């Protein structure tokens, strides 16, 4: 499933794997020839990755001659979309939860912008600082300022705290049916002796009265046997809040029976990963006719660029 998950160029890659002879015959074997026939570049104003200001960016963003492209691809592919399959899955309601940046976050975003300017102008050696480091720090900052520095204050209106409020309220409302929730964060996974949003969320929920045994980290299930046991507990409702990353809790996670809410605490790099996350709850076998997917974003940070 999902052969085109991140970039439109993946369609070309799939055709090279499956239809090399066809591409050769039609003189489309080189990417430039294929792209000029089936792709259209568009220039749009988008947020700069460091979170400050805007920039014009040209991207390969639209398919062109789409019926002709699909006719060629269908010689090797039998395509079924979720709409065509009409599977008995719950209706998903999406909610964007926006947190305002703190003064500290604003200052740090400005620092990221200054670092990016130095990198772009070549004023700093790439081994010392580069855009990968800057975007990595930007993602951490967008999630919680304490990941950058654990001594910074825990802001009551941060997106982590907004998420905790949400999880608790849904947990409380779903007590009778023992409804369950998934929380996704690819950053700040649990590690000994280091600040982690996983531990922070768990401790805050416990302090509000959620039993510790009803909260689990996917990282604690480090074997297939333990994973199966954990998923069985979520399906039965004995574990009601499961926190994990896309890599460990994406494809292959089958615990949808009582899932009522999914929380995207951070935004993964690839659009296909968001689909994988959503596929855990929008799934056959879920007893709820409607489910909720919450996406948390910190305004004016790298978060906004990613989403």
Regions flagged by a language model, labelled:
Residues 3, 7-10, 65, 159, ...:
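An acidic site on a long C-lobe helix of protein kinase domains
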Residues 87-249:
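Conserved Helicase C-terminal RecA-like lobe
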Residues 3-4, 17-153, 169, 293-307:
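Inter-lobe coupling linker of SF2 helicases/translocases
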Residues 18-19, 171, 235, 282:
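Protein kinase-like catalytic domain
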Residues 7-15, 253-255, 306:
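Short regulatory helix/loop adjacent to the ATP-binding pocket of P-loop NTPases
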Residues 9-12, 71, 161, 199, ...:
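Surface-exposed alpha-helical interface segments used for non-catalytic interactions
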Residues 3, 206, 210-305:
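Conserved RecA-like P-loop NTPase helicase motor core
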């Amino acid at each position: 499933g999902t052969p085109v998950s991140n970039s439109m160029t993946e369609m070309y890659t799939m055709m090279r794997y499956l239809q090399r002879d066809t591409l050769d015959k039609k003189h489309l074997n080189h990417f430039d020839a294929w792209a000029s026939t089936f792709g259209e570049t568009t220039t749009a104003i988008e947020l700069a990755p460091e979170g400050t200001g805007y920039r014009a960016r040209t991207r390969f963003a639209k398919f062109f001659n789409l019926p002709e492209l699909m006719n060629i691809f269908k010689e090797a592919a039998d395509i079924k979309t979720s709409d065509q399959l009409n599977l008995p899955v719950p209706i998903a309601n999406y909610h964007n939860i926006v947190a305002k940046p703190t003064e500290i976050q604003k200052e740090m975003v400005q620092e990221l912008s200054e670092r990016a300017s130095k990198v772009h102008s070549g004023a700093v050696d790439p081994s010392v600082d580069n855009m990968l480091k800057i975007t990595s720090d930007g993602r951490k900052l967008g999630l919680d300022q304490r990941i950058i520095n654990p001594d910074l204050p825990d802001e009551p209106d941060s997106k982590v705290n907004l998420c905790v409020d949400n999880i608790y309220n849904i947990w409380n409302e779903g007590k009778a049916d023992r409804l369950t929730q998934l929380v996704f964060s690819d950053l700040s996974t649990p590690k000994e002796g280091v600040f982690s949003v996983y531990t922070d969320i768990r401790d805050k929920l416990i302090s509000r009265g959620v039993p510790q045994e009803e909260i689990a980290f996917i990282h604690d299930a480090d074997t297939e046997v333990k994973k199966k046991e954990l998923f069985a507990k979520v399906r039965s409702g004995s574990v009601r809040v499961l926190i994990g990353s896309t890599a460990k809790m994406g494809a292959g996670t089958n615990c949808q029976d009582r899932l009522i809410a999914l929380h995207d605490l951070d935004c993964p790099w690839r659009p296909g990963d968001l689909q994988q996350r959503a596929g855990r709850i929008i799934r056959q076998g879920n007893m709820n006719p409607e489910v909720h997917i919450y996406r948390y974003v910190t305004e004016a940070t790298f978060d906004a660029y990613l989403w």
